[in-house]
Amino acid sequence: MKSVRSFIRDDIQAMSAYQIADVPPGFAKLDSMESPVHPFAGHETLLQEWQARLAAAPIHLYPNPSGSGLQEALRSAFDIPDCADIALGNGSDELIQFITMLTAKPGAAMLAAEPSFVMYRHNAALYGMDYVGVPLNGDFTLNLPAVLEAVRKHRPALTFIAYPNNPTGVCFTRAEIEAVIEASDGIVVVDEAYGAFNGDSFLPQAGSIPNLIVMRTVSKIGFAGLRIGYAAGCPEVIGELQKILPPYNMNQLSLTTAKLALQHYGIISANIDSLKNERERMFAELGKICRLNTFPSQANFITIRVPDADLLFDTLKQNRILVKKLHGAHPLLEHCLRITVGSPAQNDAVLNIIRQLYCQPTDFL
């Protein structure tokens, strides 16, 4: 009798699953770019309104994302032009998956700068696309000549550009991204998962550039648990994407919460501004620490390079702080760690541990 595994694709069996760390109670979770606080905390009236709307949500019915009012709320909050259509996904991960499926003709290629979000490469492999990874410069800036040469040579059906980039936090220039879009015949997805922390966006151009899709998520602005992503682009492309997205792919409670949040976006924006201020404070303090390379960030995290990534990761973990160890994920990420910007107290705890390791004479580094 054949093993059940013999019916499973060999290439999938060779893959590794995305690992989500188990976080013991009481740990500061600074590994996944989540908000350190509930987005409605401190706003009692808004909390009461939220609870009332959740209680009234028709959870006995399948959701209708297109009729929920969320698309209109997104359009209003983020200045998405009327000429653009909007597709909603169960997190931007789902949109990455189905945009890849949309373009995965036999022999088609996907292009991305590296290191970047690991799910680009993962989905290319899942759908049989040739993957072209173009290394960044050593300071994590975009190697534009190399990217343009790869576009010319491989003619990718799909290109992903994270703006700002994850896991580095560095933001490529707008002119560089415009050059890639102009040089590409295929679809270019500008992934603005961290766009709220950047201050610039391609959303106003969505719908007017035929091969541009702009993708965002509510996860990084305080709503990671909702799993809502959205993609804006020309109706010709978004209409094709809508054909393959699963029906009822979002739930009533998430739709209700997201719509309410966008109707009170001033509160959410104030939370974002607080995190941006903490990011700048943390960046300045890290810059004072010797033997540390701190990369400029336009996201809600900071990436650093240290003499020994394992030592710092383990020391932080011993002190009940979890960060993301990037060392080993890509050659350019040697001895790098990514630290989510947390609360002031959490950030101070991280800074104090790093100072203890790198601002005192030691014999073991």
Swiss-Prot record:
Any one of the GO BP annotations: L-histidine biosynthetic process
**The reaction(s) this protein catalyses:** L-histidinol phosphate + 2-oxoglutarate = 3-(imidazol-4-yl)-2-oxopropyl phosphate + L-glutamate
Q: Could you list this entry's UniProt keywords, alphabetically sorted.
A: Amino-acid biosynthesis, Aminotransferase, Histidine biosynthesis, Pyridoxal phosphate, Transferase
Pathway assigned in UniProt:
Amino-acid biosynthesis; L-histidine biosynthesis; L-histidine from 5-phospho-alpha-D-ribose 1-diphosphate: step 7/9
Q: What class of enzyme is it?
A: transferase
What does the record give as cofactor? pyridoxal 5'-phosphate
Oligomer and partners: Homodimer.
Name the chain's protein.
Histidinol-phosphate aminotransferase
Species whose genome carries this gene: Neisseria meningitidis serogroup C / serotype 2a (strain ATCC 700532 / DSM 15464 / FAM18)
Classification lineage = Bacteria, Pseudomonadati, Pseudomonadota, Betaproteobacteria, Neisseriales
Q: Which gene encodes it?
A: hisC
